[in-house]
Amino acid sequence: MSLLTEVETYVLSIVPSGPLKAEIAQRLEDVFAGKNTDLEALMEWLKTRPILSPLTKGILGFVFTLTVPSERGLQRRRFVQNALNGNGDPNNMDRAVKLYRKLKREITFHGAKEVALSYSTGALASCMGLIYNRMGTVTTEVAFGLVCATCEQIADSQHRSHRQMVTTTNPLIRHENRMVLASTTAKAMEQVAGSSEQAAEAMEVASQARQMVQAMRTIGTHPSSSAGLKDDLLENLQAYQKRMGVQMQRFK
């Protein structure tokens, strides 16, 4: 796996699924391929994106700044600086300085990532802030190692909380989660179906599912009534795809 592929993988792992994620993936691909060279416009676009947490925006801004060639005097962006200040905690800043000194001795992406993984997310963000504010310099490879270590930590904590939700025994949470998944699967079906004539059936199934979820939410139902809703939808989607000769496992 190439370095940039690895960076893209880690960065996208912390972006919530949805149309915005696809947009960000495209922007990253363009930047890494040298197709997007307007850093100013890129940062302005990033700043106004909804849904993303300030830290995610800060990390993306840091990656864009590392990758897109820019004039030396280009102004640093406040939204990135604020996100990478380690919540203003002086302990984070102290640890970030220690980490920075260690990173200065590293020359490889993997070496930097290994060193960085033993620090807290706050310290890692502060260290990125140091480099972003030009208070310290490391090679691009080492900076990417720092980025990926930070993303790995964030993705780990997201995964833990996701697992807790999936394994929760609270029937109300499980019920709502099934309905949300059914709703997003229906939305995805509508997108995949596109505008072909054969797509009418898939659109109909998706539309019915969304109406059912809406009705269940409006009148309130027994928590077990949503069991199998998403699976039924996926079965319908896969049957439709087989007929269309399309194979899309990614909704699983």
Swiss-Prot record:
Oligomeric and partner information: Homodimer and homomultimer. Interacts with NEP. Binds ribonucleocapsid by both interacting with genomic RNA and NP protein. May interact with HA and NA. Cannot bind NP without genomic RNA.
Tagged with keyword RNA-binding: yes
Family: Belongs to the influenza viruses Matrix protein M1 family.
Membrane among keywords: yes
Pfam families: Flu_M1, Flu_M1_C
Taxonomic placement: Viruses, Riboviria, Orthornavirae, Negarnaviricota, Polyploviricotina
Gene that this polypeptide is encoded by: M
Ranges where the record places region RNP-binding: 165-252
UniProt short sequence motif Nuclear localization signal, positions renumbered to this chain: 101-105
Gene3D superfamilies recorded: 1.10.10.180, 1.20.91.10
Listed GO CC annotations: host cell nucleus; membrane; virion membrane
Miscellaneous comment in the UniProt entry for this protein: Most abundant protein in virion. When expressed alone can form virus-like particles in transfected cells.
Primary localization: virion
Topology with respect to the bilayer: Peripheral membrane protein
GO biological processes: viral budding from plasma membrane
GO molecular function: RNA binding; structural constituent of virion
Cellular compartment(s): Virion membrane; Host nucleus
Biological function: Plays critical roles in virus replication, from virus entry and uncoating to assembly and budding of the virus particle. M1 binding to ribonucleocapsids (RNPs) in nucleus seems to inhibit viral transcription. Interaction of viral NEP with M1-RNP is thought to promote nuclear export of the complex, which is targeted to the virion assembly site at the apical plasma membrane in polarized epithelial cells. Interactions with NA and HA may bring M1, a non-raft-associated protein, into lipid rafts. Forms a continuous shell on the inner side of the lipid bilayer in virion, where it binds the RNP.
Region (Membrane-binding): 1-164
Listed InterPro entries: Flu_matrix_M1, Flu_matrix_M1_C, Flu_matrix_M1_N, Flu_matrix_M1_N_sub1, Flu_matrix_M1_N_sub2, INFV_M1
The entry's keywords: Host nucleus, Membrane, RNA-binding, Viral matrix protein, Virion
Protein name, as recorded: Matrix protein 1
Domain of life (superkingdom): Viruses
